[in-house]
Design a protein with these regions (language model features):
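Noncatalytic, solvent-exposed loop/strand surfaces
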Residues: 19-468
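Sec-dependent signal peptide recognition
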Residues: 2-10
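Hydrophobic h-region of N-terminal signal peptides that target proteins for export
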Residues: 10-19
């Protein structure tokens, strides 16, 4: 009886996630303030599709050691940020030859269920071979876009696969430099996808497609010679109407791509604007940013830089300005009080944090964001490099690609840092940090140089201190 009892207890622990060898729980978070405003984070860039959130009652400051670590989860290969909604956290990575979706409790990290499928892919440049696109959630259906261009719909309460589309087989998608990268976008009952298909004899293929969210049935397609980029499509209001913006352009000879403006319901093309570096080894990756009622900022880092576009009453595009020295690699810049802030540049040595005026694109300041850090008795000069920006409660937070996290005070005159900590020292920390219900989620994508930490997802207590 004793043996059976022990086995019974063991099974209970496994079911409840207490025997998860990859999960390490450090502490409990503070209670969430009753006055706190919280928001779901159902997709890449959040509810507002621009890297901003209305979360309030957040931690006012923190020391060099960083906010309190609540839990950490060892992960496989991935560049995907977590998705949080419906009281669940969804993590997407590659482990043991399988792309793996995990549903976990956001506060404890405990596993609720997982879903796996086999993939064969190896990044040709030696980067991570895991998924690039974050899961996208709408109601009770979650959409996955894997690194091999496999599109799947998963029911979040049962982990049941509802439908699956192989974009390579169905539309002739050819995996680009870094595999498939753009996250889908769910608009009403449609899943909008930057397909990047290739037609017969290299003719125009299905560039963008819409699928029924519940069945996966094709609803409409838009054909174009521009291939899939690493920029995720978004739907935003322009001149009072919802418009689908797709910044297309991946691996192709000759290099081509640019912004497509489409009706999300029908796929009708309003206009297209060519914006792509001439170099073969270039891609478009930064998500378009809508500014005001009728303007959109697009950028790339391989030579063209950034451009501000304006839509007229017929949704035709004209150029307001171009600035070759203001181009983001993949990060989404923030627009604050008629100024654009972002990490501009292609590679680590040439990246600078810059501020440009919306009105004319003039660059007001640039900062290399260098700082000193002691590692194993050695003084190192590090930077935020190709960092990410997150705006909450009118506060701006930045994650550097080597693991530094800080709060920025941004003005047209410059940048000041109010709190900063080196959470870890590891390269390729490119996923956008997420704040949900006062908890901060940060991804480490490569093995750390300090304490040999493995790739992991970390949850920090970012709730404000109690006033009692």
């Amino acid at each position: 009886m004793n043996l059976y009892f022990r086995f019974f207890i063991f099974c209970i622990l496994v079911v409840n996630g207490l025997c998860d060898e990859r999960l390490q729980i450090h502490a409990n978070p503070k209670p969430l303030s009753k006055d706190a405003i919280t928001e779901n984070w159902p997709r890449f860039l959040g509810l507002h599709n621009d890297g901003t959130s209305k979360e309030t009652n957040l931690l006012k400051s923190w020391g060099k050691e960083g906010p309190k670590l609540i839990w950490e989860l060892k992960r496989g290969e991935t560049y995907a940020s977590p998705t949080l909604a419906k009281g669940k956290l969804f993590s997407f990575d590659l482990a043991d030859g399988n792309e793996r979706l995990e549903c976990r409790d956001p506060e404890s990290g405990k596993l609720i269920w997982d879903y796996k499928y086999a993939v064969k892919y190896r990044d040709r440049f030696g980067y991570s071979s895991g998924p690039r696109a974050s899961p996208v959630l709408d109601d009770d259906i979650l959409i996955l876009a894997g690194v091999t261009a496999q599109l799947r719909a998963i029911e979040i309460n049962t982990a049941k696969e509802l439908w699956h589309i192989d974009l390579q087989k169905k539309y002739g998608h050819e995996l680009g430099f870094f595999g498939y990268g753009p996250a889908p976008f769910i608009w009403k009952d449609l899943v909008l996808v930057n397909v990047g298909g290739v037609g017969e004899n290299k003719s125009k293929g299905v560039c963008v497609a819409a699928f029924d969210r519940k069945t996966g049935k094709e609803v409409w397609v838009h054909k174009d010679s521009w291939g899939a980029s690493y920029s995720s499509p978004i739907v935003k209001k322009i001149r009072g109407k919802e418009v689908l913006l797709v910044f297309a352009g991946g691996e192709s000879r000759p290099a081509h791509g640019g912004l497509l403006a489409l009706d999300p319901g029908s796929g009708k093309l309003y206009d297209r604007f060519s914006w792509r570096a001439d170099s073969y080894e270039s891609v478009n990756a930064s998500v378009p940013v809508v500014i005001g009622e009728d303007k959109v900022f697009i950028s790339e880092c391989y030579g063209k830089g950034g451009a501000l576009l304006k839509f007229d009453e017929n949704y035709k595009i004209s150029v307001q300005w171009e600035e070759r020295k203001f181009g983001m690699h993949w990060m989404t810049p923030l627009v604050i009080n008629d100024h654009i802030y972002g990490f501009s540049g292609r590679n680590k040595p040439d990246v600078q944090f810059k501020c440009a005026k919306v009105s004319d694109g003039s660059i007001l300041w640039q900062d290399d964001m260098r700082y000193q850090f002691e590692l194993n008795g050695r003084d190192l000069t590090l930077s935020f490099f190709r960092g990410s920006l997150l705006k909450c409660e009118n506060r701006v937070f930045g994650l550097g690609e080597d693991g530094v996290f800080a709060e920025f005070m941004l003005t047209p005159k410059g940048v000041k840092i109010s709190s900063q900590s080196q959470l870890f020292v590891a390269e390729q920390s490119w996923a956008l940090p997420v704040i949900h219900k006062g908890l901060l989620y940060i991804s480490q994508h490569t093995r750390g140089f300090v304490n040999d930490t493995k790739p992991r997802l970390m949850c920090f207590d970012f709730r404000e201190e109690s006033s009692n």
